[in-house]
């Protein structure tokens, strides 16, 4: 057995490709699930089927103060992080599914929804379809607050 020489060993590196294989200029779509409540904003990217999570960042991961988790600034930082990760993986276009809390609670998206969507577009991601997927009750349990409502 011959002794190994220093600095002479040949290392073969396998080319590792993350994400789908695509031609130049071809759009590779993912789905951006943006959940904007009045307490936090989630930006969650999945593959086109929605089964495989690619990246998920929240507003609370980007700011220190609890009161700032749902702010437009935190949502913008989260969306920029998500866009960078998507570009690394080869995803260059997104379908948007925007969601508010819904159900018996508010059906209005929180303050971070619009800024997260705008930050994704400004980061160079192509936007496909935008859909509101807030859960709307057809007929459901009684809303919190009692018969006479919330008294201030």
UniProtKB/Swiss-Prot annotation:
Question: Subcellular location, in the record's words?
Answer: Cytoplasm; Nucleus, Nucleolus
UniProt family annotation: Belongs to the universal ribosomal protein uS11 family.
SS bond list = none
Q: Which Pfam families match?
A: Ribosomal_S11
Supply the source organism for this entry. Answer: Caenorhabditis elegans
Q: Kindly list the GO CC terms recorded for this protein.
A: cytosolic small ribosomal subunit; nucleolus; small-subunit processome
- InterPro entries attached to this UniProt entry: Ribosomal_uS11, Ribosomal_uS11_CS, Ribosomal_uS11_sf
Provide the GO MF annotations for this entry.
structural constituent of ribosome
Output the GO biological process annotations, alphabetical, semicolon-separated. ribosomal small subunit assembly; ribosomal small subunit biogenesis; translation
UniProt superkingdom: Eukaryota
Description of how the protein assembles with itself and partners = Component of the small ribosomal subunit. Part of the small subunit (SSU) processome, composed of more than 70 proteins and the RNA chaperone small nucleolar RNA (snoRNA) U3.
Q: Per its UniProt record, what PROSITE patterns does this chain match?
A: RIBOSOMAL_S11
Is Ribonucleoprotein set as a keyword in this record? yes
- Asked if the Swiss-Prot or TrEMBL record annotates the protein with the keyword Lipoprotein, the reply is no
Give the encoding gene's name. rps-14
**Any idea what this protein is called?**
Small ribosomal subunit protein uS11
Q: What does this protein do?
A: Component of the small ribosomal subunit. The ribosome is a large ribonucleoprotein complex responsible for the synthesis of proteins in the cell. Part of the small subunit (SSU) processome, first precursor of the small eukaryotic ribosomal subunit. During the assembly of the SSU processome in the nucleolus, many ribosome biogenesis factors, an RNA chaperone and ribosomal proteins associate with the nascent pre-rRNA and work in concert to generate RNA folding, modifications, rearrangements and cleavage as well as targeted degradation of pre-ribosomal RNA by the RNA exosome.
Extract the PANTHER family matched here: 40S RIBOSOMAL PROTEIN S14/30S RIBOSOMAL PROTEIN S11 (PTHR11759)
- Keywords linked to the UniProt accession: Cytoplasm, Nucleus, Ribonucleoprotein, Ribosomal protein
């Amino acid at each position: 057995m011959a002794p190994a020489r220093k600095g002479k060993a040949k290392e073969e590196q396998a080319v590792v490709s993350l994400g789908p294989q695509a031609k130049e200029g071809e759009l590779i779509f993912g789905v951006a699930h943006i959940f904007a409540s009045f307490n936090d904003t989630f930006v969650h990217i999945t593959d086109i089927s929605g089964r495989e999570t690619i990246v998920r960042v929240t507003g609370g991961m980007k700011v220190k103060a609890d009161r700032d988790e749902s702010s437009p600034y935190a949502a913008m930082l989260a969306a920029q992080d998500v866009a960078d990760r998507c570009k690394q993986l080869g995803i260059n276009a997104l379908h948007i599914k925007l969601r508010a809390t819904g159900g018996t609670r508010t059906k209005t998206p929180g303050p971070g929804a619009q800024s997260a969507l705008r930050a994704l577009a400004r980061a160079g991601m192509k936007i496909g379809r935008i859909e509101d997927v807030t859960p709307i009750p057809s007929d459901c349990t009684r809303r919190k607050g009692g018969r006479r409502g919330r008294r201030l």
